[in-house]
Amino acid sequence: MPTEAHVGDLDGSASSQGGTWKATVTVTVHTSSHSPVAGATVTGSWSIGGTASCTSDSSGRCAVATSAISGGTRSTTFTVTGLTHATMTYKPAANHDPDGDSNGTSIVVRKP
C-alpha cells in the first residue's frame, strides 16, 4: 500500500464575469506510481490574497476557485501549501506537472 502522495498536475482556467473574472485551478493528487489518491485535502494560497482548499475525489482531482477578481488584475498565482491524507504523507519534492503549465506546486492563471 502506498504511503506517499504528491501533486501530479495543476491546471488553471479563467472565466469572465462582467467587469471581473474568476480563476479556477484543478489539482490532481496521486501516488509515486501515479495512482489517483481520493480523500486528500489540498490547501493553498492565491497571490491576490486568500487561501483555498479542496478534497480529492476518486479520480484524485479537486478544484479551488477565487471569488471575483478585479478586471484590472491580469493574473493570479495559486501555490499549494499543504496536502493531508489519513494514511499517506505528503512528499512535496515529488510534485510535478506532465503538461508543463506549472511546476506542480504553483500555477499562474491569466485573465481571459
Residue ranges and their predicted role:
Residues 1-24, 30-31, 108-112:
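Beta-strand-rich domain onsets/edges
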Residues 23, 34-46:
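Short, ordered, surface-exposed loop/turn motifs in non-cytosolic proteins
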Residues 28, 41-53:
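Short amphipathic beta-strand segments in non-cytosolic proteins
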Residues 52, 62-64, 105:
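Short strand-edge motifs at loop-to-beta-strand transitions and within beta-strands
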Residues 56-70:
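Glycine-centered loop-to-beta-strand initiation motif
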Residues 70-77:
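Short glycine/proline/serine/threonine-rich loop/turn segments at secondary-structure transition edges
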Residues 78-98:
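Enriched for extracellular/lumenal, surface-exposed ectodomains of secreted and cell-surface proteins
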